[in-house]
Each structure stands twice: as C-alpha cells, then as structure tokens.
Amino acid sequence: MSQSIKQLYGEKLGALDGEIGHVKDFYFDDRSWVVRYVVADTGNWLPGRLVLLSPHAIGSVYQDGKVLLANLTRKQIEDSPAIESHKPVSRQYEAEYYRYYGWPYYWLGDGLWGLSGFPILETPVKPFAGEPANQVAPEPGNPDVHLRSAQAVKGYNLQAGDGAAGHVADFMMNEESWAIDELVIKTGNRFTGKEMRIPSSSVKRISYDDSTVYVNLTKEAVEQSPEHHLASPGAAHAECVIL
C-alpha cells in the first residue's frame, strides 16, 4: 500500500525508551527513487544536529498507534555519528553511519536495499573493531548528490515534453520498501487545479538549479493520469484512493 509522504510530516518519532521528536523531512535517492532516511526534528534534545533514522530502524511505515517507533535507544541515537544540520550527507558519512549500527550498506548489490529488497527491521549489532568506516566511500567530504530532500523538491515545477504541466505536490511511498512509486502533481491553477499521480519512472531528471522536474510525458498524459485523493488524516490508516 502507498503512503502520502506529506501526511507523515509532524508524526511523532519514538525510541525504545521514549520519544525523540517528530518527522521533519525525508531524504530520497533520485536515481532509485527510494527514501533512505527519515529526518527527525528533536527539538531541544540534540540542537544543531541533523538526526537521521534509516528505514532499517523502523521497518514498515505503517505501525499501530500514532508514533513511528525506531528499534533504537535514545542513547544509541545520541551517540551515532553526528552531522551538522546545514551540511550535505556524504557517502563517507553514510558508511560511518551504517557501520556504527552494523547494518548492510544499501549501495552494495542490485536490490533497492542492496542485497535485500526491503529494509528489514534490524537490531543494531556492534561493528567489527578496526574496520575502516570509509572502506567503500569516495573522497572525504564528497556529498552524495543524488540524496535529496522531499520537502525541498515539493513545489518544483513539472516540465513535460511539450511544456509546463504543473508542480510537485506530494510523493507516494510504498509502506514496506520505502520506494517512491508515484509523484503527485498539481495541474493548472495552484488553487483550483486537480492533483494527478504520475509514475516516478517517468522522471528524466531533476534540475536543482531551476527547481524543475523533467518527465518523458506530454501535458495531456499528465492531465489524463489517475486523479489523486486522500482519506481524511484522522482515519486509522490513511488509505490513498485512485479514482
């Protein structure tokens, strides 16, 4: 089942021993279209730090209750490799982060999550002492330019093959694999236009210089795509319906 990313903003995040904050953003890979991290707003707990939670710590997006629970303690999160909130996430940092928790690198293998198709909920294991954190990393400080903020891309213009076709309003994410299967596009007027769903596989590229998503669809194809409707946020399990 698909989940609206927009509906998850502000959801509470919990550790094994207490709350840690709420969902602020999602970082996704714009090559494979998979969410790699939940960005947590921890308030005054860890100020100035970019706190990332891998789907390996959460498992499925849909959990009973109103809190997304991570299979981690607050101490584990606090002691995890730190990165300043304004810094890009480098592959070197990711290697250190994954090694700290003892999880397999998602960039090794052909699957969405490396050697596995889904981010299995895993208990962190103590890494082997002496194993270099940058064993599979590129040059230090080199950011992974394909890791993008969903909050930042929301609002980008959509450019079809024959002209402007609207703007990005939301993303639809698979609850088990965390793959972004569809983009929600607001067509026409920003206030009166309809919201349509197009496959992420139709995206040719994203230009971050001019805030535009380019797709291999025509404007007519976008306008004739399945219309997007969401159940009310108060529903027990917000189900997305295509009409």
Predicted regions and their residues:
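Peripheral interaction segments used for macromolecular assembly
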Residues: 1-243
